[in-house]
C-alpha cells in the first residue's frame, strides 16, 4: 500500500512513544487517524488534542466507519499487542493491510537518507541530540524519536526540504531490520530482550544483520570496544567513537560549576570548546556520536557548537526536576544494568560529596530474572536504594521473580528497603534526601509530580 494514497490509519497501541510519533506524522499528512490504547496518559490526551480519535476500551464497536474500508485504511500495531486482541482480530479477519510500527517506519525511511541510532542504551538521547543539531541548522531533518524532545515538546520533527531522517533504531523484536540506514551509530550491544532473542549470541547476530542493511556509500560509527562483528556491504565506511578514544572522541574535558566543555576530535575536522547543554558526563559520549552524524550530514562547525549548547535533553532521560542548594531530584528512564551504572556514575561525578538515593522500579519479569545480579551490582554504587515492585508491561508474573532477587544481592552495608509504589511518598517523607533519582521504564514516572511536591516542602 502506498502510504501517500491512504485515507485513514488505525493504531493498536497508539500511546506508545514510538507509535505516537507515527500518529503525529500521519496527522501532519492530513490523514484520518484513530486507534486504541490500554490506558489514558498525558501523551494520548495530547494526541487527541492534535486530532487523533483514540479510545481505551478493547471493542470492535468503537472502530468508526472511517477505519472500516480495507482499500483505504492502514492498520499499525505494536508487538506488545497480543494476537487475541479483539480489534487486531477484526482487522486481520477482514482483509486489512496490517503492519508493525517498524515496518511502516521502514517504508517511510527508504526514500531518504536515514541517520539511525541503534544500541542497547544511549540511543534515545543520541538520536534526539542529532535531530536537534540538524533541525536548528541549514540542513534540517525529519525525525522519529523514542522520547519527547525538551527543545520541541514532541517526538516528531518535520521538514519539507531535507532528505535526512533521524531514526531511533529499536532492536526489540528485531524491529530495526526493517530500516535501510544511510549512516548508523551503534552505542552499545549489552544483551537485553532475552525473552525475544533467547541467547546473547542471537542478540549479537541481530546487530550484525542490522549492519548489513546500511546503504553502500554510507557509514557505520561504532562505539569503540563494544562486542560487534559488522557485516558491511561494499562501499560502507567504518568508524569508531567513544569519550576519549576512537576516530571521533573528546579531549581537554573540563567539568566544573555545573558546566561541561570539551574539544571535539574528528577525521572530518576538530571543533574546540564544545559546551554541553545538558551537562552530565554521560552526554560527552552521546554528544561525540551526534556530532559525527551532524558533520557527515554537512553541518558547519558553528551550527554544531550552537546546537550542542542549546540542547535541552529528553523527557525522562537524566531529567532534572529539582536542582537547588537543598536538594536535587531527577527522573531517568534507565532500565538496563549498564545504563543504570552509567547514570549513577554521572551523578557521582556531579555530586561527589552528597548522599545519593535511588528509587528503582524493575521493568519486566524476564529482564529481572536474567540480570538481577547485574542490577544489584550497578545499584550497589548508590548510598541508598529503595526498590518497588516489578513493572510487568507485556508480561505475566514468573514464579520466584520479584524485586527481592535484586534486594538480596545488593552489597553489604548499603541502605536498602522495599515498598509498594503506592507507598513511595510515605517512605520518602521519612528520609533526609540530598540527591534523589527515580530509575525505570515503567510507571514510576507517574509519581514524579508528587515527589517534587514533597521535596519542595522539606
Swiss-Prot record:
Q: Which protein are we looking at?
A: UDP-N-acetylmuramate--L-alanine ligase
At the top of the EC hierarchy, this enzyme's class is ligase
Entries under Pfam families matching the protein: Mur_ligase, Mur_ligase_C, Mur_ligase_M
Citing just one GO molecular function, the answer is: UDP-N-acetylmuramate-L-alanine ligase activity
Quote the cellular component terms of the Gene Ontology held in the record: cytoplasm
State if Disulfide bond is listed as a keyword.
Answer: no
Give the UniProt subcellular location, in the record's own words: Cytoplasm
- InterPro entries, per database record: Mur-like_cat_sf, Mur_ligase_C, Mur_ligase_C_dom_sf, Mur_ligase_cen, Mur_ligase_N, MurCDEF_pg_biosynth, UDP-N-AcMur_Ala_ligase_MurC
Bilayer-spanning residue ranges: none
Question: In which family does this protein belong, per the annotation?
Answer: Belongs to the MurCDEF family.
* Binding-site residues for ATP, renumbered to this chain: 119-125
**What pathway annotation does it carry?**
Cell wall biogenesis; peptidoglycan biosynthesis
Under catalytic activity, the entry for this protein gives: UDP-N-acetyl-alpha-D-muramate + L-alanine + ATP = UDP-N-acetyl-alpha-D-muramoyl-L-alanine + ADP + phosphate + H(+)
Q: Which Gene3D superfamilies match?
A: Mur ligase, C-terminal domain, Mur-like, catalytic domain, NAD(P)-binding Rossmann-like Domain
